[in-house]
Amino acid sequence: MLQLHPSEIKDLVLNGGVIAYPTEAVYGLGCDPDNDTAIQKLLAVKQRPWQKGLILVASEFSQLVDYVDESQLSAEQLEFAFSKWPGPFTFVMPIKPHVSRYLCGEFDSIAVRVSAHDGVRALCQALGKPLVSTSANLAGEDPALSGDEILNAFEGKIDALVLGALGEQRQPSTIIDARSGKILRNGQ
């Protein structure tokens, strides 16, 4: 398995590669959100049903505008999300019509986060777009907390391990429905 720095992954991801990378709290699995083949590979590796949907992480909100239908959110709803970003808050927002079902699952919305983690931000900046994000584990198992765990669990199944350090969080992000304001998962 390749071991790369964030600045070295652009071509691999844009050509359909699936990567493992450190996030705020655990290692994540990621790929290009515009490549259905890569998303299907990620879902197969994780053994996750497509119907559940996935998260997009970004370095700034402008990377998410091709996926999120802002016209369905009020200025106040958007401002609330912006007040929490970058940070450990994931917002469920309405999708634009062209967004892949493999990303949003059986929903008319998608979970999005503007990350405060330097490594995640560097990945998204290198790509020039958001990154699909899901915890690096098989469905129902604990997420990986080290590069060694990634190598043991995913050798031969993913294309690269991105080098870097986990963030300081020990809990997953809080998930909030942007339309209703309802907290769907309490996190950090």
From Swiss-Prot:
Belongs to the SUA5 family. TsaC subfamily. Keywords: ATP-binding, Cytoplasm, Nucleotide-binding, Nucleotidyltransferase, Transferase, tRNA processing. InterPro entries: DHBP_synth_RibB-like_a/b_dom, Sua5-like_dom, TC-AMP_synthase, TC-AMP_synthase_SUA5. One of its GO terms (cellular component) is cytoplasm. It holds the Pfam family Sua5_yciO_yrdC. Residues 3-188 form the YrdC-like domain. The keyword Nucleotidyltransferase applies. This is Threonylcarbamoyl-AMP synthase. Signal peptide: none annotated. It is found in: Cytoplasm. It comes from the Bacteria. It catalyses: L-threonine + hydrogencarbonate + ATP = L-threonylcarbamoyladenylate + diphosphate + H2O. Its EC number is 2.7.7.87. The keyword Cytoplasm applies. Its main location: cytoplasm. Required for the formation of a threonylcarbamoyl group on adenosine at position 37 (t(6)A37) in tRNAs that read codons beginning with adenine. Catalyzes the conversion of L-threonine, HCO(3)(-)/CO(2) and ATP to give threonylcarbamoyl-AMP (TC-AMP) as the acyladenylate intermediate, with the release of diphosphate. One of its GO terms (biological process) is tRNA threonylcarbamoyladenosine modification. GO terms for molecular function: ATP binding; double-stranded RNA binding; L-threonylcarbamoyladenylate synthase; tRNA binding.
